[in-house]
From Swiss-Prot:
This is Uncharacterized protein RP030. InterPro entries: Uncharacterised_RC0039. Pfam families: DUF5394.
Length: 219
């Protein structure tokens, strides 16, 4: 990723790429057996489920208060970092706040998409969680759980996360400019590319093709 700041007229494109990368990251992390175990552990915890429901209630508000959403997610992370196995690392408050700010925006974007899809065939659609189907509500719940689990994973595996940061950098440049651009920056060395799964490379190639054609992401 270059160090140049984005101009206002390209900010929308950058946000689209960021949303896509978050989705890629979620998929990669949740394929890990270790993280699946943590996910299952938290899923069986009634208190954790209750906290998820409280976050869903915030997503239901028409104001979509970003500050409240961030506060709830940060509280959830702090609470369960202490309860999850093998956690001996000191929390990086700045890193947590930065990640939460970015992903809170992503969650709200996904919330709107799920609500829109769920209300597509209604005569008088309303942007309220109560009108969602059971599946849509489950999708929202899993989305938030996935984010919470990813934060726990970050603090359990700092070295692995460093590798994923390199991969994310490669993915960003791959989507924006294809393999030619991606090879010029961090994460694009031959040995790095060989370490990425063929399935991921295909997803990024598809995303790049969609980006070139429609100026949007299609993963």
């Amino acid at each position: 990723m270059t160090n140049n700041q984005f101009s206002e007229d390209t900010k929308k494109i950058a946000d689209q790429i960021k949303d896509s990368l978050i989705g890629i990251s979620d998929n990669l992390v949740l394929e890990s057996k270790e993280v699946e175990e943590i996910f299952e552990e938290l899923s069986k915890n009634e208190e954790f489920d209750y906290e998820i429901e409280r976050i869903l209630a915030i997503l239901n508000e028409q104001t979509m208060d970003l500050t409240q959403l961030q506060s709830r997610i940060i509280l959830l992370i702090r609470k369960y970092l202490d309860k999850t196995k093998n956690l001996k690392l000191k929390m990086d408050e700045k890193l947590i706040n930065k990640n939460v700010a970015e992903v809170s925006n992503y969650l709200m974007h996904q919330h709107s998409k799920i609500v829109r899809d769920a209300n597509k065939n209604l005569a008088k659609p309303k942007d309220k969680l109560q009108s969602l189907t059971k599946q849509a509500r489950m999708d929202l719940k899993r989305l938030i759980k996935s984010f919470a689990v990813y934060q726990v994973y970050m603090f359990m595996n700092p070295k692995r996360i460093a590798g994923e940061t390199k991969l994310m950098n490669f993915a960003y440049n791959m989507i924006k400019g294809g393999m030619k651009l991606a090879k010029k920056y961090e994460g694009g060395k031959e040995k790095d590319i060989k370490s990425y799964s063929p399935r991921l490379i295909k997803k990024l190639e598809k995303a790049h093709a969609g980006f070139k054609k429609n100026n949007s992401i299609s993963i």
